[in-house]
């Protein structure tokens, strides 16, 4: 019985160990430029291969169609070791991601 408990405990500990060091990732680069109400730009890069850049611009200022148009790109390394990249826009027509791994409608 004691050996069963010890084996079960060892299995539980082994299963709890993270497979990737993402919890220890460090921020290598961070930029943030708040242009005020008319726009923004920011980006970051982490030690585990994540990158993200985004900018936004206010369009049609002072009209009923006023809105922000966002453009960006992010990438990350998946559990399979492949780097996935997505470029996107978001605005009046919704969120539009584009990436080699994303199916096209």
From Swiss-Prot:
Name this polypeptide is given: Flexible cuticle protein 12
This protein's GO CC annotations: chitin-based extracellular matrix
Residues of the signal peptide: 1-16
This protein's UniProt keywords: Cuticle, Signal
PROSITE patterns: CHIT_BIND_RR_1, CHIT_BIND_RR_2
Organism encoding this protein: Hyalophora cecropia
GO molecular function: structural constituent of chitin-based larval cuticle
Positions of the Chitin-binding type R&R domain: 37-105
Gene: CP12
PANTHER family in UniProt: ADULT CUTICLE PROTEIN 65AA-RELATED, CUTICLE PROTEIN
InterPro entries documented for this protein: CHIT_BIND_RR_consensus (IPR031311), Cuticle_Struct_Prot (IPR050468), Insect_cuticle (IPR000618)
